[in-house]
């Protein structure tokens, strides 16, 4: 676990992302423009601004890892889902992340 309640540690995230990416759903809660400029391979874009009205469209069957560029929006997404759908398994990545168009990234935990 990361430092914030509900967060996943960067090392744990990177291990899952590299070794078992199909074991989780990655949801990028940034705006589409940010998403188009680079994201994690296999991620789904579901902006925080639309999340509440799309809660029933969230994928089920595997845990969800929410992420954004700095951890604030992903933390809000996690809290929102826990409030309305507490049975869902979700965590968020509390980290500063920068992507390039080719999918490369740098990540720094909080």
Language-model region placement:
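Rhodanese-like catalytic fold shared by cysteine-dependent sulfurtransferases
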Residues: 1-24, 32-63, 72-110
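Short, surface-exposed ligand- or partner-binding patches at beta-edge/loop junctions that are enriched
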Residues: 67-68
